[in-house]
Amino acid sequence: MGSQNSSLDLRRVGVHAWSWFTLASTFLLLCSGGIVTSKGVGMSVPDWPTTYGYNMFLFPISGWVGGIFYEHAHRLIASGVGLLTMILAAWLLAVEPRRWVKNLGVIAFVAVCVQGLLGGLRVSLFKDEIGIFHALLAQSFFCLLGIITIATSPKFFRGGWDVFIPDPVLKKLALLSTVLIFVQLALGATMRHEHAGLAIPDFPLAYGEILPDTAPTALDAINTKRLADDIVPTSAAQIWIQMAHRGVAIGIFLAVVSVALRAFRNLVARRALVWSCIWLLMIFCQVLLGAWTIWSNKAADVATIHMALGALSLFLGVIFCFRLHRGIQAGRFCVPDTQTARDFSSIA
């Protein structure tokens, strides 16, 4: 019996370690994709699934130059993540006793297959719209792997994620913040793939105003000046997409501040306070990076870091919501002591 338990524990540790490896590789893939988009080299390799007629895995290293290097490396990393995910899904089906975790593994495998197809279609059909969906699915897939990694951890098995946190309002605020971040990432992906990142070249104002004038005559004047400064013309739609991006950024910051304040008032949820403070710091840094992206004339490295921190902000939001959900569910199986109930009633 002891040897069976030891073998089971070893398998659990193994699948958890593999989950971590897959998660880290996926983050590397996200950063790689961000570099490709930031540098505008997504079409450096115009064919798919081949690379200039070669089998993707046999393309000679001598051809890895310029933009081809970034796009081809992105494809190879993506292939590796696909293989890692396939093994992870099969491993979960083989050893995981919980059906919902098995299902997450299958969903992850389907998602990575669809993601690869979207990446190929983005090249084959040369459609920016596909690139936007490709970016959003990548973010969602990353978060899904995070849930799988947590669910396979020894701490999760021991009930460490089921500590009673009796605050549904905190969960709703965290969920609202996370949804806003996803909307923000959608706007960011649209800006990146529609090349609207510098539709407004100044910050915090927009063409010297709080709200830019995009009437036809004003837009003509804007584009005349942009052409004089050797900047490609823009459109009213691109300008307002960036304004929406800025507006949602303010909404996210205020929402995460409300999460931190709510956690601070809940004496029972000290763990939630640490999470929310880290989250707030990430959002603050993200706002600074967004400003720096504009001030640096959308430097590729700054824009990529901005994208990567956005992915981590969404990731933390999803994991935080999952943590709060488990904490509230734990209330079905335990009754808080009198002091805990009194502490909660003071903020409810």
Q: Can you annotate each of these PLM segments?
A:
Residues 1-12:
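Short, Lys/Arg-rich, polar N-terminal cytosolic tail immediately upstream
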Residues 24-32, 103-122, 176-184, 274-292:
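Small-polar-interrupted transmembrane alpha-helices in polytopic inner-membrane proteins
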Residues 36-45, 113-136, 191-201, 287-311:
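Interfacial helix-loop-helix junctions of multi-pass membrane proteins
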Residues 37-72, 197-238:
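Extracytosolic (periplasmic/ER-lumenal) interhelical loops and adjacent juxtamembrane/interface segments
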Residues 92-106, 168, 260-279, 341-343:
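Membrane-interface helix-loop-helix junctions at transmembrane boundaries of multi-pass membrane enzymes
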Residues 147-165, 169, 173, 315-348:
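A juxtamembrane structural motif centered on a specific transmembrane helix
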